[in-house]
């Protein structure tokens, strides 16, 4: 019964997505798409001396070799080319070389910003963007977060990727982003952030309350990643779903299923928002 409920929600989400895509296509000339994608442990095949990534090596328990790595790079590039978003925050890339491989595989012409995070798992953020749309000015690497300040169509905006960071509020204060003139877009999984205190809204809250999400936990969809901002000029927001991103069980098609290689994309689906230009 629960499986049928999950399937119905997926099918409804697909219909909802088609409506959004048609609407977004008409608006694209005046809207800017921003997406967040947790690519779920995209390691290279080289053992690190700074953290334990042994499982993601040819000799490790997952037998992570060049063929599997290249396939995942192609998979992520396929998703990015399908979305065609001018700005994409990635999380779960091991290093700059991985980011560069993704960008080189994409048909879309992305520039990128990467900073090494001091995580015990070695996973980083990277911001991909069209260089003629987003103009970065300042980059701040933070605990479990990356903030890139820049401008879109002459308007200053701070784009923050975060993964369970408990100090996003401190980052906002330190960068002086609390003023009414500061435009903020926070992408990823929030943790202990008082939205009201900073004048922020969770654009995916309504979808989450309705039972939709971007990953499956147990037998239920969960909105693990969010899009939070103080912007009012948004046209649409949602989870990016394509049939080829889903497995036969109608869950996100991941790279590994219960430790067995399945050659998929990620445990997570991308989330996105369109901003009025």
Residue ranges, per PLM feature:
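Bacterial N-terminal signal peptides
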Residues: 13-21
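Structured beta-strand-rich core segments of catalytic domains in phosphoester-bond hydrolases
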Residues: 93-156, 160-161
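N-terminal, active-site-proximal structural segment of metallo-dependent hydrolase catalytic domains
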Residues: 25-105, 276-277
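Active-site beta-strand/loop signature of hydrolases that rely on acidic residues for catalysis
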Residues: 34-39, 76-99, 160-163, 171-198, ...
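Bacterial N-terminal signal peptides that target proteins for export
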Residues: 2-14
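Second-shell loop/turn segments in exported
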Residues: 61-67, 84-90, 114-115, 164, ...
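Metal-dependent phosphoester-hydrolase catalytic domains
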Residues: 176-184, 191-277
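Acidic/His-rich catalytic or pseudo-catalytic neighborhoods
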Residues: 42, 59-71, 144-186, 243-272, ...
């Amino acid at each position: 019964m629960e499986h049928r409920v999950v399937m119905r929600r997926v099918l409804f989400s697909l219909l909802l997505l088609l409506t959004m895509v048609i609407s977004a296509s008409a608006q694209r000339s005046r809207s800017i798409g921003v997406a967040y994608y947790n690519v779920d442990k995209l390691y290279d095949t080289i053992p690190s001396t700074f953290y334990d990534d042994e499982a993601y090596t040819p000799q490790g328990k997952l037998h992570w070799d060049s063929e599997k790595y290249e396939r995942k790079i192609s998979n992520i590039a396929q998703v990015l080319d399908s979305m065609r978003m001018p700005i994409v925050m990635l999380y779960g890339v091991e290093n700059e070389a991985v980011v560069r491989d993704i960008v080189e595989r994409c048909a879309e012409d992305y520039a990128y910003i990467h900073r090494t995070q001091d995580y015990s798992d070695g996973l980083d953020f990277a911001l991909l963007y069209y260089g003629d749309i987003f103009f970065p000015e300042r980059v701040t690497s933070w605990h479990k977060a990356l903030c890139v300040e820049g401008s879109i169509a002459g308007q200053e905006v701070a784009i923050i990727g975060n993964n369970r960071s408990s100090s996003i509020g401190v980052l906002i204060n330190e960068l002086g982003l609390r003023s009414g003139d500061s435009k903020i877009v926070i992408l990823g999984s929030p943790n202990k952030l008082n939205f009201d205190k900073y004048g922020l809204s969770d654009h995916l809250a309504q979808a989450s309350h309705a039972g939709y999400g971007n990953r499956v936990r147990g037998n239920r969809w969960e909105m693990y990643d969010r899009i939070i901002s103080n912007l009012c000029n948004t046209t649409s927001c949602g989870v990016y779903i394509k049939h080829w991103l889903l497995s036969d069980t109608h869950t996100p098609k991941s790279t590994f299923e219960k430790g067995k290689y399945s050659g998929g994309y990620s445990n997570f689906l991308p989330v996105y928002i369109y901003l009025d230009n």
